[in-house]
From Swiss-Prot:
Coiled-coil parts of chain: 18-91
Compartments, record wording: Secreted
Record's keyword annotation contains Chaperone: no
Full protein name: Olfactomedin-like protein 3A
Domain of life: Eukaryota
C-alpha cells in the first residue's frame, strides 16, 4: 500500500514537471510570435513612410516638370516672336541698305521711293477705339505724399483696374516699389510697406509705362533698347532697339528722358526727338505685344522748355515750364486724327505746385494724371470734352 502511494507521488511529480515545461515552451513561443509581430509592424510602418515620401517626391517632380514645360513653351513663344521681328528688321535693313547697283539709278525713281515712304508715314491713323475726348481743364489737384528724390515716376497699371501702385525713384535705378492700393501707399512710412521688384537692368530717364501687368522701359546704356518686363513672372519677355538714329532728350527741362512711353485708350505710344527734327517732338504708335513701331508722326511741338507730355485718345499734350519753375501749362497739342487744331486747342494751366514735373502719366481707366513733382506724388483730375473735327 505504501509502495502504491509512493508510485502515485512519483507519477504526480512527473506530470507536474511536464506541465511546467509545456507552459515554459508555450510562453517562449508566444514571446517569439510577439517579437515577430512587433518587427512586422515596424517594417510595415517604415515601408509605408518610405512609400509616402516616394509619392511626395514624385508629385513634386511632376509639378516641377509641368512648370518647366510651361516655361519652355513660353520661352519658345518668345523666341518665335523675336525671330519674326529679326526677320522683319532684316527685311527693313535690306530695303534701306541694299547692295549698290551696277548701273546708274534714275534720280526720279529715287525721289518717287522717298516720297512713298514719307506718304506712308503720313497715312491717316486707323483708330482702335471710338474715343474722342480732349482736355478742357484741370478740375482738381491732390498731393498724396512725398517720397524719393526730385525726379522719378509713379503710376498704376494703365491697362487694368488692379489698383496696384508702382513707385520708380530716380533716373537710373532698377528697383520698383509695388503697393496694393493708393491707400496702402499713402499710409505707409516711405516705401517700407511695398513689395520690391528688382529689374534685370537699370532704367534710363522717367519715361516708363506699366500696361497690362508689364513694365515697358528704356534700358540704361548707349543703345536705345526698349524692355518689356513681366511683373508677375519677373522675367523679360521681349526687347527691341528703338528704330530711330541720333536721338535727343525729348524734353529740354528733363534731359534724362530720351523716350517717354505713354498709355491711352488706343494703347502704347512713344514720345521722342531726333537730330533730324531737333527742334520738335516726334510721336510713334507701338504694338505692346511685339514692340514694333506701327506709325510715326512729326509734331509741331518744340522741345525747348518742355517738361513732360501725355496722350489722351490719340492726342499728345506737351507741358511747358521755364528754367526757373513757374506754372506748368499745356501749350502744344497734336492729334493724330486731325480732329484737334493746335491753334484752337485751349491752353490749360496747372495749379501752382513746388517745381516742375519730371513725369506725367495718364490713366485712361480713371481719367487722372499721375504726376511726380520734386519728390511729391500728385493726382490731377481732368475735365474732358468731345473733340470737334476741324
Amino acid at each position: 500500500m505504501r509502495a502504491l502511494q509512493l508510485l502515485v507521488l512519483v507519477l504526480s511529480g512527473l506530470v507536474g514537471a511536464q506541465q511546467q515545461a509545456l507552459m515554459d515552451y508555450l510562453e517562449r513561443r508566444l514571446l517569439a510570435i510577439e517579437d515577430r509581430i512587433s518587427l512586422w509592424h515596424e517594417q510595415t510602418s517604415r515601408y509605408a513612410s518610405e512609400l509616402r515620401e516616394f509619392k511626395q517626391q514624385m508629385v513634386a517632380q511632376l509639378e516641377g516638370l509641368d512648370k518647366s514645360k510651361e516655361a519652355l513653351r513660353s520661352e519658345l513663344d518668345t523666341v518665335g516672336t523675336r525671330v519674326d521681328r529679326v526677320e522683319r528688321e532684316m527685311d527693313y535693313l535690306e530695303t534701306q541698305n541694299g547692295a549698290q547697283p551696277c548701273v546708274d539709278v534714275d534720280d526720279k525713281l529715287v525721289e518717287q521711293q522717298v516720297t512713298f515712304v514719307k506718304e506712308r508715314n503720313k497715312a491717316k491713323y486707323a483708330k482702335l477705339t471710338d474715343c474722342s475726348d480732349m482736355i478742357s481743364s484741370i478740375k482738381a489737384m491732390k498731393i498724396l505724399k512725398r517720397v524719393g528724390g526730385a525726379k522719378g515716376m509713379w503710376t498704376k497699371d494703365m491697362g487694368s483696374a488692379t489698383g496696384k501702385v508702382y513707385i520708380l525713384n530716380g533716373t537710373d535705378d532698377n528697383t520698383v516699389f509695388e503697393f496694393g492700393t493708393v491707400r496702402e501707399f499713402t499710409s505707409s512710412q516711405g516705401t517700407s510697406g511695398a513689395t520690391t521688384i528688382q529689374l534685370p537692368s537699370a532704367w534710363r530717364g522717367m519715361g516708363h509705362a506699366i500696361y497690362n501687368n508689364h513694365m515697358y522701359y528704356l534700358k540704361q546704356g548707349e543703345e536705345m533698347k526698349l524692355i518689356k518686363f513681366d511683373l508677375q513672372k519677373n522675367i523679360i519677355v521681349d526687347s527691341a532697339v528703338f528704330p530711330v538714329k541720333n536721338q535727343l532728350p525729348v524734353y529740354s527741362l528733363n534731359p534724362e528722358t530720351f523716350i517717354d512711353l505713354a498709355v491711352d485708350e488706343e494703347g502704347l505710344w512713344a514720345i521722342y526727338a531726333t537730330q533730324e527734327n531737333e527742334r520738335h517732338i516726334s510721336l510713334a504708335k507701338i504694338d505692346p505685344k511685339t514692340l514694333d513701331i506701327q506709325q510715326m508722326w512729326d509734331t509741331p511741338c518744340v522741345r525747348e522748355n518742355a517738361e513732360a507730355a501725355f496722350v489722351i485718345c490719340g492726342t499728345v499734350y506737351v507741358v511747358y515750364n521755364s528754367k526757373l519753375p513757374s506754372r506748368s501749362r499745356i501749350q502744344c497739342v497734336f492729334d493724330v486724327s486731325d480732329m484737334v487744331n493746335n491753334d484752337e486747342a485751349p491752353h490749360v494751366y496747372f495749379p501752382k505746385r513746388y517745381g516742375t514735373h519730371s513725369s506725367l502719366k495718364y490713366s485712361p481707366v480713371e481719367q487722372l494724371l499721375y504726376a511726380w513733382d520734386d519728390g511729391y506724388q500728385i493726382l490731377y483730375k481732368l475735365q474732358l470734352k468731345k473733340k470737334l473735327e476741324v
